[in-house]
Regions:
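Short acidic/polar active-site loop segments enriched in Thr and Asp
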Residues: 8, 55, 116, 175-177, ...
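A short, glycine/Asx- and small/polar-enriched loop/turn
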Residues: 51-55, 112, 240-243
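Short beta-strand scaffold positions
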Residues: 2, 120, 259-261
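Alpha-helical recognition/docking segments in bacterial nutrient-uptake
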Residues: 11, 56-59, 64-168, 172
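N-terminal helix-turn-helix DNA-binding module of bacterial transcription factors
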Residues: 1-53, 346
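A generic local structural motif
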Residues: 43-45, 103-108, 126-128, 243-247, ...
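Generic structural signal for helix capping and beta-alpha/helix-loop junctions
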Residues: 19, 51, 102, 127, ...
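Bacterial carbohydrate/catabolite-sensing allosteric modules
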Residues: 36-37, 83-87, 134-142, 146-346
Length: 346
């Protein structure tokens, strides 16, 4: 193309990448000739090798890729990251390294990701892929967990305080027999009733903080925290909450309130209760956490967290870090939503 037009290769590059460096007539001539010759423009791979910039952000999540299409809160979060990337002229690469993926394959995916930095979404501190991300030596922002990772910025919420406020509300209605349906507490495949040992040492900070929030509220209300019935769900499936609700009620038929650490669990639990003739809230109080549109539409009592904003801020912190160069922790506000699914015990 340069030979055809009798110009330098720099001129060709400027026509595609820095049009302000050329006159409008010259750039139009370059583009028209390129189209006639079938030349699509500079090779992006070659350009990234030369500039050492990939022009993309890697979003690492220890979940199957389908999780971000099935879970509404996670979907909003990804949309937020995508918005910040789009506004700042960057691409977004999803790196899904869920439990079903072989460790070697997942490691290769992280090592081979052509990105300028990573947003790591809600993993435990000993997650093997987190260590691989850190070994890349690229900028990193963590979302939700792990907390307190040295030298790394984080965006999240105060999970303990948010869950404490919700539990205070439930206990204030008079409930004393409470079941708590949680997302997975560790990386290993386990679900069902949670024993005391596992309950005291969850690998995931978010679930641990939400459990502690309920315990603190129970203790303040004079209720033994050890009386809390906890059921763990490993997978995020439409029926997960219903399965967990069944297990909780079988373990303790005296339960009058089911608190859930995610709206997706609460909505599924409500479906199970309705199918079994248990009226909400007349016979059972149900609460969630996230504030997703489906939950709000069904009147769920829940905690709303700004998932979209969380994604946006994570992307912005990665792409436009503080001038100080020091890591920051941003704690976003939550809101207790008093819906139609909580009432006094029957």
């Amino acid at each position: 193309l340069a030979d055809e037009l009798k110009v330098s290769r720099t001129t060709i590059s400027n026509a595609f990448n820095r049009p302000d460096q050329l006159s409008a007539d010259l750039r139009e001539r370059v583009l028209a000739t390129a189209k006639r010759l079938g030349y699509p423009g500079p090779d992006p791979v070659a350009r990234s090798l030369r500039t050492r910039k990939a022009g993309a952000v890697g979003l690492v999540m220890a979940e199957p890729l389908t999780y971000f299409f099935n879970d509404p809160a996670a979907r909003d979060f990804v949309a937020g990251v995508a918005q910040s990337c789009e506004e700042l002229g960057q691409g977004l690469l999803l790196v899904a390294v869920g439990a079903s993926r072989r460790l070697d394959d997942g490691t290769a995916a992280v090592l081979g990701a052509g990105v300028d930095g990573f947003v790591v979404y809600s993993v435990c501190e000993d997650d093997p892929y987190l260590q691989v991300v850190l070994q890349r030596g690229l900028p990193v922002v963590v979302v939700d967990q792990p907390k307190g990772l040295a030298g790394v910025s984080r965006v999240g919420i105060d999970d303990r305080a948010a869950m404490r406020a919700l539990a205070d509300y439930v206990l204030g209605l008079g409930h004393r027999e409470i079941g708590l349906l949680t997302m997975r507490l560790g990386r290993e495949l386990r679900q069902g009733l949670v024993d005391a040992d596992r309950l005291r040492s969850p690998a995931f900070d978010v679930q641990r903080e939400r459990i502690i929030g309920v315990w603190e509220a129970m203790a303040a209300a004079g209720v033994d925290p050890d009386s809390l019935t906890v059921v763990e769900s490993y997978e995020h499936l439409p029926e997960s909450g219903g399965t967990a609700a069944k297990a909780a009620l079988e373990a303790n038929p005296r339960i009058t309130a089911l608190m859930c650490t995610a709206d997706i669990l609460a909505l599924s639990a409500m479906d199970y209760l309705r199918a079994h003739g248990i009226y909400v809230p007349g016979q059972m109080t149900v609460t969630g956490f996230d504030g997703v549109p489906d939950a709000i539409g069904r009147g769920l009592t829940t905690v709303a967290q700004p998932s979209l904003q969380k994604g946006r801020r994570a992307g912005e912190l990665l792409l436009k870090p503080p001038r100080s160069g020091l890591p920051v922790v941003e704690v976003l506000a939550t809101e207790l939503i008093r819906g139609r699914t909580a009432g006094p015990p029957a």
